[in-house]
Design a protein with these regions (language model features):
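Active-site/ligand-binding neighborhood in enzyme catalytic cores
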Residues: 90, 101, 107-108, 112-116, ...
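Glycine-rich FAD pyrophosphate-binding loop
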Residues: 22-45
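C-terminal segments that line or cap access tunnels to active or ligand-binding sites in enzymes
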Residues: 248-250, 258-403
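Dinucleotide-binding Rossmann-like beta1-alpha1 core, especially the glycine-rich loop
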Residues: 46-121
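Internal hydrophobic alpha-helix adjacent to the cofactor/substrate pocket in enzyme cavities
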Residues: 420-431
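N-terminal Rossmann-like FAD-binding beta1-loop-alpha1 element of flavoenzymes
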Residues: 3-28
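Short FAD-binding loop at a beta-strand-to-alpha-helix junction that anchors the flavin cofactor
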Residues: 393-414, 419-422
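Short hydrophobic core segments
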Residues: 6-8, 29, 246-260
């Protein structure tokens, strides 16, 4: 069988490519039974709908906003972010650096003093200065206090590496940088000013994030699921799968770079070596259904302290009441890991205990649903090897007419909106 464009992976990036190819001949090959990648939901026997962690639509592009509204129509709600940090036994608003109000007085003054000192000493400092690692950037941008109580411990917990080895290439607009006035205002008043790229978000009213995928795939007839790729012959332009061979003109890959390098026959040694230098963080996504309504009024909470094994927890009912049966609540808890040794059962037990110690769960709460989703590839690590390794691999793939896109195909920190736009843009290169 010969196809103009073969798309590897049915996540949102791959689906976007197919959607924007319109009437051209293509096929999506997806290894799972359902498309969506990490942008999908599961429904358990009790009627709880769980996403693969919090999948919220932070949309800036007019095009993507128009597309999402076209697909979901009335099944779309705009939410104002209500996110918090739990540390020092108190809740403070997100972002930490602009909302110190509620913390012990000593910590507030330590954070303000450090911030002022950083501003005085580093007035010419630029995020674009590549000589700085993320650790240095935190100290130069926020000072010792804010770095000590949130930026350093939280990011060490998320990335699972020494953040002195983390570059600043991923930052973009993801880390809010408040002014001195905003820091002081947020230190002495309960300031609800929305700061950051995710101050608002869209989310489906019904069906979880899966509803976006369901509407998108209605416009994409060329989808094959349960397809396992065994090898790719770039000289003959053939993809070999468990259901036969497929000859292509263009190959678009959204699968993780280390995985596609393994699949290609005769990969040069320098490309193999570059692939082995790529690093990433995995996430264990624990979902719980609780027989109590309104366990929290928050969207999600960050946990920077080491005593908690998770870095973030969110509450589905506050995205949409349709995600929980009547009289119940549900939540997702995210635990990042690299080379996990602890069993899922032990991690679940510890997580429940820590949620109780933070008084999010009560000792009397009855957990009526548990769903653990393992995400092997979750966050790309930006270290000193990423840029050169990525360039080596992508140059090789491009030379062989393979377009590698998306979070893991492009090996980058990106959003659902980014994936949709990149999928659209990629179609311009497919002839």
């Amino acid at each position: 069988m010969k196809i103009d464009t073969v798309i590897l992976g049915g996540g949102i990036a791959g689906l976007s490519v197919a959607y924007h190819l319109k009437n051209k001949k293509y096929v999506i090959l997806e290894k799972e039974h359902l498309v969506g990648g990490l942008c999908k939901s599961v429904t358990d026997k009790n009627g709880f709908i769980y996403d693969y962690t919090g999948h919220l639509l932070h949309i800036k592009s007019k095009y993507v906003k128009k597309l999402v509204r076209k697909l979901l129509k009335k099944n779309l709600a705009l939410k104002n972010r209500n996110s918090w940090i739990y540390s020092n036994n108190v809740f403070t608003r997100y972002p930490f650096q602009a909302n110190l109000f509620g913390l012990p007085e000593k910590i507030i003054y330590e954070c303000i003093e450090g911030f002022v000192e950083a501003k005085l000493l580093n007035s010419q400092f630029s995020i674009l200065n590549s000589q700085f690692c993320f650790y240095d950037w935190c100290l130069k941008t926020f000072g010792n206090g804010i770095s000590k109580y949130f930026m350093i411990p939280y990011n060490e917990k998320l990335w699972r590496i020494d953040i002195k080895k983390l570059t600043c290439d991923w930052l973009g607009n993801y880390v809010p940088q408040p002014t001195l006035q905003e820091v002081i205002t947020g230190a002495f008043t309960d300031n609800n000013k929305k700061i950051g790229y995710n101050a608002t978000f869209f989310y489906p009213k019904m069906g979880g994030i899966q509803s976006l995928i369901d509407e998108l795939k209605k416009n994409i007839p060329g989808i094959k699921t349960d397809v396992k790729i065994s090898s790719i012959d770039i000289s003959k332009k053939i993809v070999k799968t468990n259901s036969g061979e497929m000859k292509y003109k263009n190959l678009v890959s959204t699968i993780p770079l280390p995985e596609i390098v393994k699949l290609i026959k005769g990969v040069p040694e320098n490309v193999k070596k570059a692939s082995k230098k790529l690093k990433w963080t995995s996430v264990l996504n624990i979902n719980l259904g609780i027989k109590r309504k309104n366990i929290s009024n928050k969207h999600w909470i960050y946990f920077p302290e080491k005593k908690f094994n998770f870095y973030r927890a969110g509450f589905y009912r506050n995205f949409s009441e349709s995600l929980c049966p009547e009289g119940t609540s549900s939540m997702y808890i995210e635990i990042s890991y690299r080379n996990r040794k602890t069993s899922k059962e032990k991690m679940l037990k510890k997580t429940i205990g820590k949620l109780k110690s933070a008084k999010i769960l009560k000792s009397s709460d009855k957990i009526i649903s548990e769903c653990i989703l393992d995400i092997p590839y979750a966050y790309v690590i930006y270290d000193k090897n990423r840029k050169s390794s990525l360039e080596t691999i992508r140059n090789y793939l491009r030379k062989n007419f393979i377009f590698s896109i998306g979070r893991f195909g492009g090996w980058k920190y990106s959003t659902m909106e980014d994936a949709i736009l990149e999928g659209k843009e990629t179609t311009k290169w497919l002839k």
